[in-house]
Amino acid sequence: MTDTMSAHMDRHNKLDYDGSEDEKKTKLCSLKKKAINASNKFKHSFTKRTRRNSRVMSVSIVDDIDLEELQAVDAFRQALILDELLPSKHDDHHMMLRFLRARKFDLEKAKQMWTDMIHWRKEFGVDTIMEDFDFKEIDEVLKYYPQGYHGVDKDGRPVYIERLGQVDATKLMQVTTIDRYVKYHVREFEKTFNIKLPACSIAAKKHIDQSTTILDVQGVGLKSFSKAARDLLQRIQKIDSDNYPETLNRMFIINAGSGFRLLWSTVKSFLDPKTTAKIHVLGNKYQSKLLEIIDSNELPEFLGGNCTCADKGGCMRSDKGPWNDPDIFKMVQNGEGKCPRKTLSNIEEKTISVDENTTMKSDSFAKNKFDAENTKFIPMIDKTVNASTWPTNLHKSNYPEPEDLYSAVKPSQRRGGEGYLFGGVMSLVMGLMTVVRLTKNMPRKLTEAAIYGGEVDKAETTMVSNQEYMSMVKRMAELEEKCRSLDNQPAAFSPEKEQILTAALSRVDELELQLAQTKKTLEETMATQHVIMAYIDKKKKKKKFFGF
């Protein structure tokens, strides 16, 4: 009996225990569900509150720099740090890459160019020019020199427009001075790099550091080449090419007359193909070409687009672009418009991860074989680039490259700049005239063969001895040095030529005045003739009416 009671009690206790376990599991499940629901509610409420309180969301900007360029930039950066030439403000791999490209990845030349830029910024006060310089005469300047940014092209680059045919250099110099305009030009360049280009990068979600330029040359004549205009464009061109290299993506010169296009087609063969590929000289049927690059809503109406900016005083005064968006502007102020500085480790880790993902899809034998064969090709993250031996892939021997032998023929490429604004184009036109005059007796095909090294009829070549080759290299180096010294000399007119040019311009003004007077006299004569003819017709009708 006692055993029966104990067995019954044990079974009862076991049932109670099982019941308590079930209750415990049920409570745990309910608590877990409550915790998950509370967590989800908190997460959703936090997300909504974050989106409601902060409309500025971060974006990822695609950086298209490759490994080879990054290695060059890293070597260049180490060289600048060793000489204390890299302020934190300019520690930007894209900025350093532009200087390297301007000097064809020659480390020493790029370093010298960078050094000159740093010294110029200190002397000119560029770092504070946006806050210190107030260009009060901006409205008058834009009246006599229509220019400005308007929208972006289909790739997200800002579009810069100038109407050179409407430039009045005389009145422009009456409302401002050359020094003040140069400061305004530098201030706008700094504004472009600090605000406009980062805003375009955010809007396009990719890095942008170049612009598209449209130059309307309709009406450009001899009056555009006054002494003041020449001085202004020379200073602007030097500043742009020395301190803001590689900022032009492409340029469209529209409404170009037959004379301008003839000069361009002649001089085009003497320029670097990379430079000429950026410049498109068009006539008066340019609308379709521009619409291929720029959307019609971003192109002003006077250039064939649909935009008028009537509420902002016209397209040339509107400064239309993504930099006017408050959210994008706030992101630019927070520094989100620039790509974070890339290191070799970033790209190497990405390369390694891609290799791992690829090999995981194969069988283990293939994976082991791949790892064994390619271990030596995986770049080391901790490996540093030796600046003294860089770049070995660009210099295969101790002899000069063929491109260097002809650098004297292409000084514009050697100086590294695309001209910006009015200065670049006016310099181009003046350069065209000069080159055509100096090279009118030079065989064109022979020149093209010398510059581009294109393949011609391959006749039997004679062997050149090492002594003859070194003699030729020495002579070419001397010629290059002479051309460099001539290129560094300031372009100045002699007093006699200045007087001749002034007299020619005065004569043109007199002829234009005489032509206007003659036209006015002719119109008055035509009006008098119409009156006389009307009087004669009236007399004839009257005579016919009375019959005598």
Curated annotation (Swiss-Prot):
Topology in the lipid bilayer: Peripheral membrane protein
Q: Which GO terms describe its biological process?
A: flower development; protein transport
The record describes the protein's role as: Required for transport of secretory proteins from the Golgi complex. Catalyzes the transfer of phosphatidylinositol and phosphatidylcholine between membranes in vitro.
Q: What is its main location?
A: Golgi
Assigned protein family: Belongs to the SFH family.
Name it.
Answer: Phosphatidylinositol/phosphatidylcholine transfer protein SFH3
The taxonomic lineage of its organism, from the top, reads:
Eukaryota, Viridiplantae, Streptophyta, Embryophyta, Tracheophyta
Alphabetical GO CC annotations of the entry are: Golgi membrane; plasma membrane
- CDD domains named among the record's database cross-references: SEC14
Q: Which PROSITE patterns match?
A: CRAL_TRIO
Ranges in coiled-coil conformation: 465-530
Protein keywords:
Cell membrane, Coiled coil, Golgi apparatus, Membrane, Protein transport, Transport
Can you name the source organism? Arabidopsis thaliana
Identify the tissues in which this protein is expressed: Predominantly expressed in flowers but also slightly detected in stems and immature siliques.
Q: Does the keyword Protein biosynthesis apply?
A: no
Q: Where in the cell is it found?
A: Golgi apparatus membrane; Cell membrane
> Which portions of the sequence form the region Disordered?
1-20
Q: Which SMART domains match?
A: CRAL_TRIO_N, SEC14
**For the CRAL-TRIO domain, which residue ranges apply?**
137-311
InterPro entries under this entry? Answer: CRAL-TRIO_dom (IPR001251), CRAL-TRIO_dom_sf (IPR036865), CRAL/TRIO_N_dom (IPR011074), CRAL/TRIO_N_dom_sf (IPR036273), PI/PC_transfer (IPR051026)
Q: Which residue windows does the record flag with biased composition (Basic and acidic residues)?
A: 8-20
